[in-house]
Amino acid sequence: MCCDISKTLCVKPFIDPEEEISHRVSFLADYLRHSRASGYVLGISGGQDSALAGRLCQIAVESVRSIGFDATLWAIRLPYGQQFDESDAQTAMQFISPDEELSFDIRSATDNLCVDLNRSLGSKISDFNRGNIKARLRMVVQYAVAAHHDALVVGTDHAAEAVTGFFTKFGDGAADILPLYGLTKGQGRALLKALGACDSIIEKVPTADLLDDLPCLPDETELGLQYRDIDAFLEGKPVSEDITMAITERYKSTLHKRMPPITPHSTWWRK
């Protein structure tokens, strides 16, 4: 089962960071030219994933410009009010060095929507539900910016998130292009190191930071799994039976998040 999942998610047990950088930058540049879009739009949180995706995109658009085409990276900060780790986000922006920086505070949109929802439902929605609203509003903003500039939205999904379904459906799971697809969390760190990222970016504790009640809750706490174990599972390395079962069950239970909407012709859900 482990091998089948890894193959489905395009995970390699070993990578050459420099080769992966070259391959993924070329992919971004080639697809941008093919699509005839004006560039890429990416939300920047301050974490490892958006920093890596952002830097790859910036190198790609510069490559496209070097051969005479217009191309821009719009990097967007999308805080909910005052972000606890705002300094990390600014460090990530400096590392990415995007062509254009934008900022949009989603707090008023989130709060107003939730007030109206609570009134309509007659009860207060959960903090988890509210967190998913934040993720989806962030994607609404990114697609609005992309539509304004005729650009493409970049997602940061990678293998460790994909296998666990650790993303918001139609939130951060929505995108036009996924340059980190197939990478484990540790492989992403290796690419950041090869790109010259500072230690604070590479070693930053991963957090979705969507919950009001538990700000900056580490991903590993929320998942109940360590990324090193998820990576080992994906790379075909030995892990305990309990970990194998936990990851496999999460993979199965979140399959709907990795599939298009179900139709009368869909059969995967019956298996």
Curated annotation (Swiss-Prot):
Question: Which positions are annotated as binding Mg(2+)?
Answer: 49, 161
Name the Gene Ontology biological process terms: NAD biosynthetic process
Task: Give the top-level enzyme category.
Answer: ligase
| Keywords assigned by UniProt, alphabetized | ATP-binding, Ligase, Magnesium, Metal-binding, NAD, Nucleotide-binding
Tell me the CDD domains matching this sequence. NAD_synthase (cd00553)
Coiled-coil positions: none
Extract the SUPFAM superfamilies matched here. Adenine nucleotide alpha hydrolases-like
What EC designation does it have? 6.3.1.5
* NAD in keyword set: yes
Enzymatic reactions: deamido-NAD(+) + NH4(+) + ATP = AMP + diphosphate + NAD(+) + H(+)
Q: Which cellular component terms (GO) are annotated to the entry?
A: cytoplasm
- Binding-site positions, deamido-NAD(+): 136, 169, 176, 256-257
Record pathway: Cofactor biosynthesis; NAD(+) biosynthesis; NAD(+) from deamido-NAD(+) (ammonia route): step 1/1
Which amino acids does the record list as binding ATP? 43-50, 156, 185, 207
Q: Does Nucleotide-binding show up as a keyword for this record?
A: yes
Gene Ontology molecular-function annotations = ATP binding; glutaminase activity; metal ion binding; NAD+ synthase (glutamine-hydrolyzing) activity; NAD+ synthase activity
Q: Which PANTHER family match?
A: NH 3 /GLUTAMINE-DEPENDENT NAD + SYNTHETASE, NH(3)-DEPENDENT NAD(+) SYNTHETASE
What is its biological role?
Catalyzes the ATP-dependent amidation of deamido-NAD to form NAD. Uses ammonia as a nitrogen source.
Q: Which family does it belong to?
A: Belongs to the NAD synthetase family.
Subunit text: Homodimer.
What is the name of the protein in this document? NH(3)-dependent NAD(+) synthetase
